[in-house]
From Swiss-Prot:
The gene is NNF1. InterPro entries: Nnf1 (IPR016851), PMF1/Nnf1 (IPR007128). It comes from Saccharomyces cerevisiae (strain ATCC 204508 / S288c). PANTHER family: POLYAMINE-MODULATED FACTOR 1 (PTHR15459:SF3). This is Kinetochore-associated protein NNF1. Keywords: Cell cycle, Cell division, Centromere, Chromosome, Kinetochore, Mitosis, Nucleus. Acts as an essential component of the kinetochore MIND complex, which is required for the spindle checkpoint and kinetochore integrity. MIND plays a role in establishing a bipolar spindle-kinetochore interaction by joining kinetochore subunits contacting DNA to those contacting microtubules. NNF1 is required for a number of nuclear functions. Cells depleted of NNF11 or containing a temperature-sensitive NNF1 mutation have elongated microtubules and become bi- and multinucleate. They also have a fragmented nucleolus and accumulate poly(A)+ RNA inside the nucleus. One of its GO terms (biological process) is attachment of spindle microtubules to kinetochore.
C-alpha cells in the first residue's frame, strides 16, 4: 500500500504550485503593476495604496486558486484515483518481479517498462482472475441447470405414470366393460380430470 499521499498526487500538487507561482509572480511585479497607474503611484500615498491593493490581490488570487484546486480534486476524487494508480503500478511491478526468473530474462527489464505497460500487466492478471471466477460460476450454473433438468424429467415421468393410472381406473370402472350403471356425476368428474390432465401435460 502506498502512503496517504501518493507520488503522483504529490507531483500533481507540485505542478499546480509551480503554475500558481508563475501566475502570482506577474501580480507581484511592482514594475508591471505600477506601470498601469503611472501618475497615481508618483505620490507617496498613491504608491502605498497600489502596493496594498497588489498585496490583497495576490492573497485573494492565491486563496481562490488553491480553493478551486482543492474543490476540483475532491469533486473528481483525484487523490484516491492517483493513489490507486500508484498501487496498481506497484503491484504490477511486484507481480512482474515475482515471475519465474527464466521468463524475466526473456522479457524486457522492469525498469524498461512504461507505466502504461505495467498497468496493462496488472489488468491482464486481473482479467485472467475474473475469467477464472466466471468459469467457476458458469460451471455451478450449468450444474444447477442439469439438476433442474433432471428434476423436470422425473416430474414429467411421474405425471405420465399418474395419467396412465387414472386412464386405467377410468377404463376399469367406467368403461364399456362394466355391467353396472355408471354414476353420471362421477363419470363427468373423472372425464373433467382426464381432460384437464391432457390439456396441462
Amino acid at each position: 500500500m502506498v502512503n496517504s499521499h501518493g507520488i503522483r498526487y504529490i507531483r500533481l500538487k507540485q505542478v499546480f504550485n509551480r503554475a500558481l507561482d508563475q501566475s502570482i509572480s506577474k501580480l507581484q511585479s511592482w514594475d508591471k503593476v505600477s506601470s498601469c497607474f503611472p501618475q497615481y503611484v508618483n505620490s507617496k500615498q498613491g504608491a502605498i495604496n497600489v502596493a496594498n491593493c497588489q498585496r490583497q490581490l495576490t492573497e485573494f488570487w492565491t486563496e481562490l486558486c488553491q480553493r478551486e484546486f482543492k474543490e476540483i480534486m475532491e469533486e473528481r476524487n483525484v487523490e484516491q484515483k492517483l493513489n490507486e494508480l500508484d498501487e496498481l503500478i506497484l503491484e504490477a511491478k511486484e507481480r512482474y518481479t515475482d515471475r519465474d526468473q527464466d521468463e524475466v530474462n526473456k522479457g524486457p527489464a522492469i525498469d524498461e517498462l512504461s507505466s502504461k505497460e505495467l498497468v496493462e500487466c496488472h489488468l491482464y492478471s486481473q482479467r485472467m482472475h475474473a475469467i477464472h471466477e466466471i468459469d467457476e460460476r458458469l460451471a455451478k450454473v450449468n450444474e444447477m441447470n442439469d439438476q433442474l433438468a433432471q428434476e423436470l424429467k422425473d416430474l414429467e415421468t411421474q405425471v405420465e405414470v399418474e395419467k396412465n393410472e387414472i386412464g386405467k381406473m377410468y377404463d376399469e370402472y367406467l368403461g364399456s366393460h362394466t355391467d353396472q350403471p355408471a354414476n353420471v356425476l362421477l363419470v363427468q368428474s373423472l372425464n373433467d380430470m382426464v381432460l384437464e390432465l391432457k390439456e396441462n401435460y
